[in-house]
Amino acid sequence: MQSYASAMLSVFNSDDYSPAVQQNIPALRRSSSFICTESYNSKYQCETGENSKGSVQDRVKRPMNAFIVWSRDQRRKMALENPKMRNSEISKQLGYQWKMLTEAEKWPFFQEAQKLQAMHREKYPNYKYRPRRKAKMLQKSCSSLPADPASVLCSEVLQLDNRLYRDDCTKATHSRLEHQLGHLPPINTASSPQQRDRYSHSTELYDNRVTLATKTYLDAAFYDNLQPSLSYV
């Protein structure tokens, strides 16, 4: 069966858009038996009129049990006596009072509930209870929420990449230093103590400068590589 929307579209796009066709538009509207309902994900699903009977069956209420039969009048009475009391608190009070009743006091309400269940079975012989699960929205703070696996993985990859980058920079720097130190003149053991002390002092000063330069270079390279990556995490 062609839906009303597609029929209207075909009518407006046709060349013979005459007054006679315009008169048939209300008939198309009446003959359309499609019921469109909005689903939970904001999309629309179409059901025929025959399938909509199942939704009526789902809306049938359950037969009342003994507690519901007893609490109807009690809830109304308690709400009138305590107008500021919340419904949840009233339910707690009614549950406590129901537990305090004896079996003899509960028995008339069990009999009434059995009668209501028998009437319900006669009226709805194919009834089956289908509980509707309600999504529980738990509001938690950001600190208690679990970390996103993708962000954790990106963080671990970033740390590993930074370690490998620093290791490569360290190896390259040490190789250049070894190459430079290999061209230094050998120490003359036969020289005077003053010359050996002067050479030792200059070598120590050179090593300190090289160490400071290496640390500065590595730190700068590390943070330059770290900051752009953090912007995508």
UniProtKB/Swiss-Prot annotation:
Annotated spans, Disordered: 180-200
Subcellular localization: Nucleus speckle; Cytoplasm; Nucleus
Entries under PROSITE patterns matching the protein: HMG_BOX_2
One Pfam family named in its UniProt record: HMG_box
Gene3D superfamilies reported in the protein's UniProt record: High mobility group box domain (1.10.30.10)
CDD domains xrefs: HMG-box_SoxA_SRY
Major place of residence: nucleus
GO molecular function, one term: RNA polymerase II cis-regulatory region sequence-specific DNA binding
Modification after translation, per record: Acetylation of Lys-136 contributes to its nuclear localization and enhances its interaction with KPNB1. Deacetylated by HDAC3.
Ranges annotated as DNA-binding: 60-128
GO biological process: cell differentiation; male sex determination; sex differentiation
Known role: Transcriptional regulator that controls a genetic switch in male development. It is necessary and sufficient for initiating male sex determination by directing the development of supporting cell precursors (pre-Sertoli cells) as Sertoli rather than granulosa cells. Involved in different aspects of gene regulation including promoter activation or repression. Binds to the DNA consensus sequence 5'-[AT]AACAA[AT]-3'. SRY HMG box recognizes DNA by partial intercalation in the minor groove and promotes DNA bending. Also involved in pre-mRNA splicing.
Quaternary data: Interacts with CALM, EP300, HDAC3, KPNB1, ZNF208 isoform KRAB-O, PARP1, SLC9A3R2 and WT1. The interaction with EP300 modulates its DNA-binding activity. The interaction with KPNB1 is sensitive to dissociation by Ran in the GTP-bound form. Interaction with PARP1 impaired its DNA-binding activity.
Record-stated family: Belongs to the SRY family.
Full protein name: Sex-determining region Y protein
